[in-house]
Amino acid sequence: MNASEKFIAAKAHVDEAAVAPLPNSRKIHVEGSRPDIRVPMREISQADTPASMGAEPNPPIFVYDCSGPYTDPTAKIDIRSGLVALRQQWIEERGDTEVLADLSSEFGRSRAADKALDELRFPGLHRHPRRAKAGMNVSQMHYARRGLITPEMEYVAIRENMNRAAYVESLRTAGPTGEKMAKLLTRQHPGQSFGASIPEEITPEFVRSEVARGRAIIPNNINHPESEPMIIGRNFLVKINANIGNSALGSSISEEVDKMTWAIRWGGDTVMDLSTGKNIHETREWIIRNSPVPIGTVPIYQALEKVDGKAEELTWEIFRDTLIEQAEQGVDYFTIHAGVLLRYVPMTANRMTGIVSRGGSIMAKWCLAHHKESFLYTHFEDICDIMKAYDVAFSLGDGLRPGSIYDANDDAQLGELKTLGELTDIAWKHDVQTIIEGPGHVPMHLIKENMDLQLEHCKEAPFYTLGPLTTDIAPGYDHITSGIGAAQIGWYGTAMLCYVTPKEHLGLPNKQDVKEGIITYKLAAHAADLAKGHPGAQIRDNALSKARFEFRWEDQFNLGLDPDKAKEFHDETLPKDSAKVAHFCSMCGPHFCSMKITQDVRDFAAKEGLKEDEALAKGMEVKAVEFVKSGAEVYRQV
């Protein structure tokens, strides 16, 4: 749908491209200790090794799956109804929440009463919000610190292990060479974890202990029961976030829901709705009700819309109402720029690009207009009270992040980081889950300093970075400039990477841009997991490499992050089905394929009863004799 077309709720439908299963993949569920803990994963099937190479079976591998029910052919998807409330029973049985008779937010009530919005409204708005009972704290951190292992924690533990034990067992029982295959395909380089403590197997107790310490969060608002629990922390798989959202210049509710379903199809672990245009409240409701992943927002954006874009007119009362409005819709984490202090603003005067964070610039303007600290800072404990009543996590915003390589690691950025560490202590006093946002634009040699200082000042609270971009010279390719920095800082310990699309600095991303950003950042996150030595991270690489060596082209495509593009590139030059079993590609052709030559050496060794190194030596002798007999000319006329 184009932005100019009218969105009508009754006609809303899911994007068909987002619900089709990926090639040779199917949704499976691993059951936990109770029947309603069913953890989704994607199973990728593989063909057997060709008879000429041993004819051994290649069991399916299992990969992390963020797509919710959208890629499950057995699920009935109707975005007008929203997703099933997966966690509803878990929330209710804890007995510490109550269903409200009406919305608590004044703005929320006014939108609900506006009949002119009926055609836009999500049909399920009869849903009543939920809040903690008086004096109760419903955060996962609070439960963890009381020693409780929640169903969410067990769910996360199963999810992080990615059914690795079942895969290893399937290798061992695959045939006479099973033990050898298991050893070969689970081999992994040790990695360098820079102090992370990653166990061989993730247990529910380990999840609980990490959440209790503040080293990980499970962003699960009690008003977003549709979400599938996931975890963000340096001792877990590196996660990625996708930003979506409309602006005053374009996009519609339909397009933003499509972007969300598209982002999670390709691997977005969380989605941030950064809408600044029309109907922000209604757009967010549609996204949350249809999202199986946590949704984040920057509440100050909507608060600013309520005062017609005049930052100096913002008040604590308007912001508080916005927090409650969004918490009761089900937002799982809020970016709040409470670390932008009055004394830091002059430090940005000599920057090349000043304050580039929208939230940071809004609060800097407010501080200067009132010549005092922002209400985000002075009311921080009041904000904590709201967060723990709904289990909304803090994403403490880096409002003074560098917007250019020139400004990297300056006093303003690092001063704010120290303040974010102090605010983390306050949030933890209230048992509110917290992550810390980071830069930005940073050259490669300064990236590790960012990670080290964050660990020091913020006491290992999860780091969440935008890239960082490692150079400023490539508009249109900033998914690559930032992907370089993302892989690096993910290796050093960043828990979640915020994607950057090719449109960064240039315009609002469309669906294809979202996919490009997601794939780039899934690659960066996976590279970081490999470098850290995360258990099982190399399984997919090993499986794909084996498929490549055995010329199982379809398996190569399907084991990759983007099967569609891999197949498209291959078929540009070799489109026929016969090319899918050929022992070469268009890069080297049939006579110069290094992998085919290696296989020929192995076949020769087996035929002659030789070891591979002996076969190479003997083969060279034979070729030398042929060379001399042919006239010993380096070049021959043909």
Curated annotation (Swiss-Prot):
InterPro entries per UniProt: ThiC, ThiC-associated_dom, ThiC/Bza_core_dom, ThiC/BzaA/B
Cofactor note: Binds 1 [4Fe-4S] cluster per subunit. The cluster is coordinated with 3 cysteines and an exchangeable S-adenosyl-L-methionine.
A single GO BP: thiamine biosynthetic process
Pfam families from the UniProt entry: ThiC-associated (PF13667), ThiC_Rad_SAM (PF01964)
Catalytic activity from the UniProt record: 5-amino-1-(5-phospho-beta-D-ribosyl)imidazole + S-adenosyl-L-methionine = 4-amino-2-methyl-5-(phosphooxymethyl)pyrimidine + CO + 5'-deoxyadenosine + formate + L-methionine + 3 H(+)
Pathway: Cofactor biosynthesis; thiamine diphosphate biosynthesis
Origin: domain of life: Bacteria
GO MF term (any one): zinc ion binding
Residues that hold Zn(2+) according to the record: H441, H505
Keywords, sorted A to Z: 4Fe-4S, Iron, Iron-sulfur, Lyase, Metal-binding, S-adenosyl-L-methionine, Thiamine biosynthesis, Zinc
Example of a GO cellular component annotation carried by this entry: cytosol
Positions that bind substrate: N243, M272, Y301, H337, S357, R358, G359, D398, G399, L400, R401, E437, Y464
UniProt: [4Fe-4S] cluster binding residues: C585, C588, C593
EC number annotated for this UniProt entry: 4.1.99.17
Cofactor requirement: [4Fe-4S] cluster
Keyword Iron attached: yes
Described purpose of this protein according to its UniProt entry: Catalyzes the synthesis of the hydroxymethylpyrimidine phosphate (HMP-P) moiety of thiamine from aminoimidazole ribotide (AIR) in a radical S-adenosyl-L-methionine (SAM)-dependent reaction.
Listed HAMAP family: ThiC
Subunit structure: Homodimer.
Family of the protein in this entry: Belongs to the ThiC family.
Protein name: Phosphomethylpyrimidine synthase
